[in-house]
Amino acid sequence: VREAIAAVVLVILHFFFLLFFFRPALTTPDANSYYVMTRLIATKGTTECRPESPLQYLGPHWKCLRDNAYYCSHAPGISVLCAPLFRSGGTGAALLLTPLLASFSLFLVFMIVRMWMGPRWGLPAAALMAVNPVSNEHALFQDSHTAVCFFLLLGTYLLLKWKMKPRAEIAFFAGAVWGIIPTVRYAEVIFPVAAMIYLALHIKTEKKALFSILSFLAGMAVPIVPLLIRNQLVYGAFWKTGYMVTGEQHAFGWDYFTQYYPVYLQKMMSEGCAFILPLGFLGIVLLFFHHTTVKEGLLFLLLSVPTTILYMAYYWPPDPQSMRFLLPTFFIYTITGFWMLRVLVGHDRRMFLGTVLTLLALSAAWGIPLSLSALGHLKGTGSVLTDVTSMLEKNAEPGSILIACDGISQHVDFSGRWRLTEMKSVESLFSPEQKNSTSSPPFSSEILLRNREGRERYGNKSGDELMELFRRDVWKWAGENGKVYLLLKKEQCSAFERHLAAGEGLEKIDEIYIDLPSPPRRGGSHVKPPFPPAGSRSGDAMQRPPPEGPVSQPGPNFSLSPRLFDLSLDSEPLLLMRWKRK
């Protein structure tokens, strides 16, 4: 009981620790993908987006399939879970789900280890993951990896519970939990396959195993069948996913694996698991040498090694966020690593205290500074975006047109409060003469415009012809009494002002400073990868932006200002200007 109370206290403290850094903001293209889909499900009951105008902004992961219907390339599972929170509490409530799942995952680690190894081992294992920097950062990154970890742990707990009490209802709920995982991330379909293999291994030794497997499959059908039906309706085949639109199925190869696996192994030690990683690997191996734990050894092997190899073979080179792909395996290595410690320590209390306290001290010395650094940066960028939102809520009427860069639009898009323009469709109108816009790094020119109608309408236009077409479309979209606002840097507003006709002008409404200290650079340089791997592609296939923003040039450059996707977070303010006309 004391250990359980201590675990609950740890979960509460961890959640409040995350809340200190939490800001209701979307700082990545992936987050825009999941949470705009959340809004669409909550307000319209669909994952489909139909732009009202060729100017309408669409996030980087939204692709047109047919008849001006756009769908996100990501799985909708996390969006379905967040939709009720959005309806009841707005954007902030929906964004709280991920940190909640991150903290609850610690309790699941405690429950798994305590049930499997004894009461004294659960709390140290949970504490170890509480200081893991990748887990803590992605608790506030608003992507899908934390949710996968939660359901992986819950599913593992139910499987081990089933082994102790092989009842059909436990198998059914386990199947439902494991079935949620591929609805959250398509590639993680290998996890429920591992769970099914684990159950199948018990057919010879457990009389009720076959019936439990059928119950497990019935449980899996609850979340997976709706996903397959959606895939059939949206993509024309139940086995197709949004990744096929972007050619992701061609993004894996042996050449990538041989080039990247040494870096991944290094990063797993330095950024991912640190000291528990070798213990975790050895623990999985040692499980095979005990006849009572062979099945668990195979389960944990299948939950860790295949997904690690898969992402090592992915075309995108290792970067500061690559460890997010392997985050679920860190929980597995922690569980098996503590099992290894238990074998080494046995029942000696002094050895238990010495080894566990040493491991926790080293892990804390490694993980806490990295966690504080990553979370502090997220807090800073999130504060910038929430401040921008507050300024817009104060000055820009709901439903008005807003022209802003992608770094702002991908966040503001979640609320649906304003109508956002795809600024890159007409970017030349906002580019100062003789130099590029400060908010448009070289990477931005490589991203195809998402709004297909806008790409066709404005793609070959320039100068006065482009401005006249833009003027006509934006005011048609705004309506007779609508208003149009710009939220851009001064030089961009000045460049646009030169294109205005007589009787038009820009009225300054407000300004906001978006300065942010440069974040510490972590290992790995961002080098543009060769994609598509299978050759050039047409249509809406696009080069995937890294999760934290544009690719920087290789090598250290400490003079660069920090960026929020394509927005330079320097000392120059963003100006909120109203486009006025007679």
Regions found by a protein language model. Give the residues of each.
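Membrane-lumen/periplasm interface segments of multi-pass, membrane-embedded glycan/lipid transferases
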Residues: 55-66, 232-288, 312-313, 320-323
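Membrane-embedded, lumen/periplasm-facing catalytic core of multi-pass transferases
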Residues: 355, 359-410, 435, 442, ...
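Perimembrane helix-loop-helix junctions
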Residues: 158-167, 191-224, 228-229, 284-289
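Signature aromatic-anchored transmembrane alpha helix within multi-pass, membrane-resident enzymes
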Residues: 1-12, 120-123, 176, 197, ...
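Short acidic/glycine- and proline-prone juxtamembrane loop motifs at membrane-interface regions
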Residues: 134-147, 409
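Hydrophobic, aromatic-rich transmembrane alpha-helices
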Residues: 104, 200, 270-301, 305, ...
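Short helix- or helix-capping micro-motifs
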Residues: 10-11, 98, 122-133, 157, ...
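Transmembrane-helix motifs of polytopic, lipid-linked glycan transferases
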Residues: 93-117, 154-158, 285
